[in-house]
UniProtKB/Swiss-Prot annotation:
One of its GO terms (cellular component) is plasma membrane. Pfam families: ZipA_C. SUPFAM superfamilies: Cell-division protein ZipA, C-terminal domain. The lineage of its organism: Bacteria, Pseudomonadati, Pseudomonadota, Gammaproteobacteria, Enterobacterales. This is Cell division protein ZipA. The gene is zipA. The keyword Transmembrane applies. Residues 40-51, 93-105 have a biased composition (Basic and acidic residues).
Length: 332
């Protein structure tokens, strides 16, 4: 019961408050509208009282009338009324002022000016006479009097910015493309060869030659046999049986030998070569080839050289062995 009564009181109070607000808004709007209706009437009445009779006849604006009222400077004016003769004087004064404003140069006397080009005084007419004269007068500029005609007729050179450089005409996208370049790719390591040829040279001393008969005896003692392609071969069996381990050829083209004329034959050197991989152990085969080359060099009085025709060194021997290991690893 108490809750229902409280709810009713709240609703009634809210309605009363809303009614008071609406009544206040309606009252204030009514007063404001009446205030705005009265203002234009008061303004028109005040403007009608302040506007003189001369202004009404001539149609001069209100601002100009206020700035030209002479009533305050004349002591004969009465505070209550204004004499009609003052309006006539005021109107005539304004007529004179207007006529003077229309022609401000009529009372100016002509002034003579000295022209440096004509060496005489030239009267300067008033602006009105100049306007009434020729519509297109010729004006001489003293700054152009001493300029040669060649300079006037010569075409002017274009400014630097009239022709932009080619570097500025290039698109931004190109300069960005040039700046951001991909990193150079590292060259890929060459794949290990699956086969190689090891070469040794046995050459005579500088300026010498190796005799054919002496060379043939040394080759036979080292286990070489004359065979295919008219060159000598070293087989697994020194008697000439089994696969070929390495071969020996003449350094002079065509690289072959003629066994029947070996006694009449001479050469600056011979070449021993071995293919890797080969039959058996390639490392042992290379060791046997190196021993055979050293033996032949001792027999004929020559020296052993590598594949670059340089003296054989322990470092070069290790290089040969490394090449053998690489090839065997590639074929594993």
């Amino acid at each position: 019961m108490m809750q229902d009564l409280r709810l009713i009181l709240i609703v009634v109070g809210a309605i009363a408050i809303i009614a008071l607000l609406l009544h206040g808004l309606w009252t204030s709007r009514k007063e404001r509208s009446s205030l705005f209706r009265d203002r234009p009437v008061k303004r028109a009445k005040k403007a009608r009282d302040e506007t003189p009779l001369d202004d009404l006849d001539e149609g001069v604006g209100e601002v100009r009338v206020k700035g030209a009222r002479p009533q305050q400077s004349e002591p004969s004016f009465d505070s209550a009324s204004v004499d009609s003769s003052s309006f006539d004087n005021y109107g005539s004064a304004r007529e004179d002022v207007r006529s003077e404003a229309k022609s401000p140069f009529e009372h100016m006397s002509p002034v003579s000016a000295y022209d440096p080009l004509l060496d005489e005084a030239t009267p300067v007419d008033s602006p009105r006479s100049q306007v009434r004269g020729d519509a297109n007068p010729q004006v001489v500029d003293p700054r152009q009097a001493f300029i040669p005609e060649s300079d006037i007729d010569a075409p002017r050179e274009p400014f630097a910015y009239d022709a932009p450089s080619s570097a500025q005409q290039q698109p931004v996208s190109h300069s960005l493309h040039e700046k951001v370049q991909p990193a150079p790719q590292q060259p890929a390591e060459p794949a290990a060869a699956k086969e190689t040829v090891l070469v040794l040279h046995v050459v005579a001393h500088q300026g010498g030659v190796i005799g054919g008969e002496l060379l043939l005896q040394s080759l036979l003692q080292a286990g070489f046999q004359f065979g295919e392609m008219n060159i000598f071969h070293r087989h697994v069996n020194p008697a000439g049986a089994g696969p070929v381990l390495f071969s020996l050829a003449n350094m002079v083209k065509p690289g072959s030998f003629n066994v029947d004329t070996m006694s009449e034959f001479s050469t600056p050197g011979v070449s021993i070569f071995m293919m890797v991989p080969s039959y058996g152990d390639a490392g042992q085969n290379f060791k046997l080839m190196l021993q055979s080359a050293q033996r032949i060099a001792d027999d004929v009085g020559g020296v052993v050289q590598d594949d670059e025709r340089r003296m054989m060194t322990p470092q070069k021997v290790e290089s040969y062995k490394a090449r053998i290991r690489d090839v065997l690893k590639a074929n594993a």
